[in-house]
Amino acid sequence: LVSSDGSIKYIFKNHNGYYCEAIYYRLEPKNNVPYERYHICISSQFGCKMRCSFCDTGNLGFCHNLSYAEMLDEINLVRQDIIKTDAENASTKYSAVIMGMGEPLNNFENINKFCTTLSTKDTRLKTIPISSVGIVPLIPKLAQLQNQLTNIKFFVSLHSPYDEQHSQIMPINKQYNISSLLSACRQYHLDTNTKVTLSYMLIEGVNDSEKHLNDLIKLINPDHFKVQLLLYNNTTDAKFIRPIIDTAQIFNERLKRNGISSII
């Protein structure tokens, strides 16, 4: 499936009949300067058991972990296809983004093998961004992996500054609340000297008020964290509404004015 912006979605089926997705994309040029690399976003699980309220994958339930070899296949198959259609750009550096279907930390053994294998064998690999809902006991293991490889960028979902609301959006918060999550992420930064990026998805009428913004600013220590602002994407069974870009810009400007590194 090819989008108007040039990104491509791939759907893979394994020998057990499970489906997963991968996406090839490039970021838009900044100040008319093209980015030097492209991105391949891969899945780490067939389905997911986290059941985040905004995510279609959670509706599938959990089926199976991808093996590290299957994750490597995702990268290799996408790259082979890109070489056919865009050989010049396919030879540049790329990032292997683990932000597709599944919760990576719940498949840590295979994530470990995948990251280690790819990092040691592919000189074109630039970074490995990994996004998690925040499985607190496993964050120290990711810190150890980052210290070995040094190319991991850790993203953690935080979609409300309030525990009660965050538990409604992301049920995992009932097990690991905001305080314990941020504490583990602060320790990750201290152990790796790499800041954690908090992904805050803006949902109209849910977490985009001025009060949310003010309390989010109070919650975030810029010494340990950066922020990535996302806009909710309408799904086939949309429960929420995508906000206008102006809302994200307001959040972005206020965060920056308070010394917090932020991007949209």
Which residues does each predicted region cover?
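Non-catalytic surface loops within mature trypsin-like serine protease
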Residues: 14-16, 26, 46, 158-160, ...
